[in-house]
Amino acid sequence: SIAVAFVPEGLPIAVTLSLTIVANKMRASEVLCKSLSTCETLGSITVLCADKTGTLTKNNMVAVSVTVHGFKSTPVDATKHIERDTPLGSAFKQVQFVGAVCNGASFDGATAHLPLSERKIYGDATDKAILRMSEEMYGVPAANAGWEDHYTVPFNSKNKFMLKLLSTSNKAGISGLNDSNTVDLTTELCAVGLVGIFDPPREEIPSVVKMIRGAGSRFFMVTGDFALTATAIAKQCGIITTEKISSFSDLDALDGQLPVYDTWADNDNQPMRALVLSGSDIMRMSDAHWEAVSRFDEIVFARTTPEQKLAVVKCFQSRDCVVGMTGDGVNDAPALKMADVGISIMGASEVALESADLILLEGFGSMVDAMLYGRLVFSNLKSTIAYLLPAGSCSELMAILAAFFFGLPQIIGNVQMIIICALHDAICSLTLCMEKPEGEMLKSKPRNVKKDRLADGKLLFHAYVFVGLPLTVCCFSMAFWDVQKRGVPFSDMWLKYSGGVIATTQPDFYAETINKGQSVFYFTAIIMQWFNLLSIRTRRLSIFQKPPIGRRETSNLMMFPAMGLSLLIAVFISYVPAIQRIFLTREISAEYFFLPIAFGIVMISADELRKYVVRTYPRSFLAKIAW
């Protein structure tokens, strides 16, 4: 009985269903959670590392310029030079030729009838841009005519190059590649020209970065692109906001001068500290360098390999940060798997999608909604636990302890305990996951996973002492009052471990009277929990400031049907004769419906007074112990 009483059996049900409901709400916001635990972890992210291409940018690369011999031109003007067969035209034609034949992308033949800008291309985004430029300048089929592709070394993020062996001669004259001459092929190359490619940032990214930083999380860029390119995009996206940008050479000089970054401190008035590092810098970094890096506010990691992205994640995790990592490529998979929350975007590679914990179905803009839901679900779960404990644990446990220490009859049946926890409280608690934020959650700091717990001392004090004890006293008073009115005085139960005179001489009458008293206890707990449900919705605000009905931005209309369903279940269990015999329940008088309502009004009024003191006197004792 003690185990049944102390453990709120509805808690696992309520928590699991709450997380499931929140995950479905996130799905409606185009955010797909692959595990329920991810919903809660999202709210505690302190460092978010974002890939550039496809995440911060549109991944819609367009070649906007071609440069040869120091002469810069647009692809359209370069085409005119080719048509006029000028010396510059010959140079531009070489660029066009290399772009067409040394390319891993290919056009979809089914879209050949469409305008060039609408034709579908298979391949890497960079290859697509160059192939489209080559088609615009002279035509890809003309460039490929007469050439055979004998050997290809595909591009990978570690080598950062791709090789193609082309020839018009007999295949018999071609010698195979080995490790030694592969190295030779990467040296003494001839620069044919430069192609400028533009991949515009997504319009929503600057505001998203600002909101995530406003929520107390640091936002970094981790990309395989060149440092200057990454820095330029970072400035456009608002990732770097200061003019002074440190580099690897500055880390030694800054050793010991930078204060440790405290996520939960007031950093608003501190000057921003920016840093740009390349993959080659990361290879040379010591633990002291990593310690210095962890203290910067704005960081761009450029030209990184998969191993280096993984090192970045581990660096911040080892310093008690909760790391979120976004990525869409195969090379991002190790870092996505290692991060506390791996985030990918719809359209990413299969490997990235498989490795991620969270998939953004409509671009990176929905990341703000994901973080908001992560914080909201934690807050609502705390409310759920605070709601479940008074009736589902405190009052039931006191009934068992009273029977053990004071010889009283167990005034609530074991089956009724389980029904209260698994049905009544579970049904009503599910409405708490529908609650809207009490304040602006994305303007507060992320929770500290090492200090902030779902059920801390303040919450337990509120649930067991401030709410649980008054509820228990009311339930006991009502139940034993009914028993005494039916002819069994309290003195005949007090310290009568084996039953008093009536229990001995009239056992059937005594058992029936106790069963009716248990039903009174049962209904009193259920009805008073309604008022606990209305009160537990807020921690600081009054019920009039956040009404459950009448105001769209604060309403929770599911509460009242849940209360009604809870009462219907109790009536069904207690008033249907066949069910009465199974659960040992009995019908109760009308007065036992209305008196708990009066007690509940007193209880919610007391909590309103407590909240008023907490709001008005934030340094008071009540404010310090408020959950």
Provide a role label for each language-model segment.
Residues 1-457, 469, 522, 539-627:
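Conserved cytosolic headpiece of P-type ATPases
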Residues 459-464:
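Alpha-helical transmembrane segments and their helix-start/interface "positive-inside/aromatic belt" motifs
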Residues 466-470, 474:
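A long, glycine-enriched binding/interface module in the latter
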Residues 474-527, 538-541:
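Membrane-interfacial loop- and helix-cap regions that link adjacent transmembrane helices
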